[in-house]
């Protein structure tokens, strides 16, 4: 009897954890044309890279080249990239100017109520979340170790955390490092 109750509790916790992660696709955001955008195509990809950005954050400005290189590197692979602006402080024009000024080749979506950032626990920009096809978080944190403190950058990047996580997913291997600490500007 006790064994049965324990198994029932474990099953409930697993179910609740699984459902909470699967709420990610149901969050409604706005694209830059004012249309509702849902991250509901997760199942079409092995993984989705969600990048939290801020047009006003110097590190987000600096990382646009790296983000573009990643998008190019994984073009044609079952990896989707989505940029999230989690703030109501930026107008569509502000976001479009950021995208144009830094030649950012990324689909940007507005999260004015910070629903997705709260759901995922994002607090910094730039911060990435690699989400699996079923909505499970495979990796979260920094893109790489270029920035190691606010205003301080390495001349040589020695850890490519996001690339390592994506490569593991594409190779059907477990992601070794599941979480790192992102460095950047706070999401407000």
Question: What role is predicted for each listed range?
Answer:
Residues 1-23:
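Bacterial Sec-dependent N-terminal signal peptides
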């Amino acid at each position: 009897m006790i064994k049965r109750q324990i198994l029932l509790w474990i099953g409930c916790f697993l179910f609740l954890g699984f459902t909470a992660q699967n709420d990610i696709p149901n969050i409604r955001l706005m694209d830059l044309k004012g249309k509702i955008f849902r991250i509901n195509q997760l199942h079409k990809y092995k993984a989705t890279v969600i990048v939290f950005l801020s047009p006003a954050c110097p590190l987000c400005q600096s990382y646009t080249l790296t983000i573009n290189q990643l998008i190019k590197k994984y073009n044609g692979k079952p990896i989707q990239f989505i940029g999230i602006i989690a703030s109501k402080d930026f107008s569509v024009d502000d976001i479009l100017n950021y995208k144009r000024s830094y030649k950012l080749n990324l689909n940007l979506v507005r999260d004015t109520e910070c629903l997705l950032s709260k759901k995922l626990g994002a607090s910094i920009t730039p911060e990435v979340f690699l989400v699996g096809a079923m909505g499970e978080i495979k990796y979260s944190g920094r893109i790489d170790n270029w920035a190691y403190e606010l205003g301080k950058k390495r001349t040589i990047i020695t850890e490519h955390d996001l690339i390592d996580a994506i490569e593991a997913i594409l190779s059907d291997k477990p992601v070794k490092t599941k979480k790192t600490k992102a460095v950047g500007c706070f999401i407000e």
